[in-house]
Amino acid sequence: MEWIKYHEAEKVFDLRTENSTYQMQVREYDTLVHLYYGCPVGDSLITDRIVCVDRGFSGNPYEAGKDKTFSLDTLPQEYTAYGNGDYRINGLEVEQADGSDTANLKFESYEITKGKYSLKGLPAMFAKEDEAETLEIVLADRVSGLKAHLLYSVFPHLDVITRAVRLEQTGETPVTVKKAMSMEMDFEYREMDAVHFYGRHNVERQMERTHLGHANWSVGSIRGTSSHHHNPFVILCDRNTEETYGNCYGYALAYSGNFTFETEVDQVGHTRVVMGIHPYHFAWTLEKGDTFETPEVIMSYSAEGFGKLSRIYHDAYRNNLIRSKYVEQPRPILVNNWEATYFDFDADKLYHIAEEARNIGLDMFVLDDGWFGKRDNDWCALGDWE
């Protein structure tokens, strides 16, 4: 079975898993719009959900002429750049060599292949050739030569779709990337909640649910790490979604550095989502021939509440993310002395703990903080190996 199809007549990209459908369409003026993500829809193409009407004070692209019904400010799009009349949050912001900060991304080409795309030096899901299919869509700024390769891999039996973006400069002048999200998605006319997991030292992974209103909402980190303060995983769901019932969408960024997850509910009730590297103090210059790859977002959809979504991620990470010989066998068990002794230990105490660990079948004993010189508290001897 083909899990990714392109319907030439309708110009629709149709991505399927066993329990979800994801569709995009190339519309007027080579604009790539987002159509649908959710329950399977059989052979249907969801092309009638986009309603083009005149929205006051929402501008229209130059190519549209006097047609006031086609506005990038209200269309559900797949991946947008700043400076084209769409004033919502966006996926890409750049600075051109002449100081311009716009990029006008137009559909250029696509390719469907077997297997999973790869990202250089970044963690990502992996697959055997028969476990996944990949779609690569190329959007191009025809003035600067900057291209955005939108990468999608479908894991049909896991109900997972992964996304990433590869930026490539083909023009003669350099382009500085100021913001490069790994994914962007629009939901039409939907009242949604966001579920995220905040925390602090000793109080990690606290769930919080927020109603999304007509405003911007975000979670993220600029600590250099994803941190226990905000996990790079967010769920969007319907207002009535519970553990065993309701629609929910998971977004997990496979990256442990600065990150952001942002939403915006716009003037007509559409919800836009972006996720990726936090743009705070971010800048990456691309000379001709250079590329930049974003981290991967692992997406999934469940029509059966949070429990089903959780199990989808468990299976995906266990089978296609963790690279370890222990994926399918019991892992070694270790004991750490820290909570048992803190700084107050000697050789006899440590030997006793290790001996008891061996007696009950544990595999390793780990000596924690305090083995330095006169390391009796947090204020002395850290790093003193004498």
Annotate each predicted stretch with a short phrase:
Residues 1-13, 270-287:
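Short acidic, Pro/Gly- and aromatic-enriched capping/linker segments at domain boundaries
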Residues 4-6, 10-14, 18, 22, ...:
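Polysaccharide-binding surfaces and accessory modules of carbohydrate-active proteins
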Residues 19, 165, 289, 335, ...:
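Conserved, mostly hydrophobic/aromatic
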Residues 31, 155, 299-332:
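Terminal connector regions
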Residues 95, 100-109, 284-303:
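Short Pro-Gly-centered flexible turn/kink motifs
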Residues 161, 176, 293, 360-361, ...:
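Short loop/turn motifs at secondary-structure junctions
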Residues 263-265, 277, 304:
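Conserved mixed alpha/beta catalytic, RNA-binding, or beta-rich assembly cores of soluble enzyme
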Residues 326-386:
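Aromatic-lined carbohydrate-binding/catalytic grooves of carbohydrate-active enzymes
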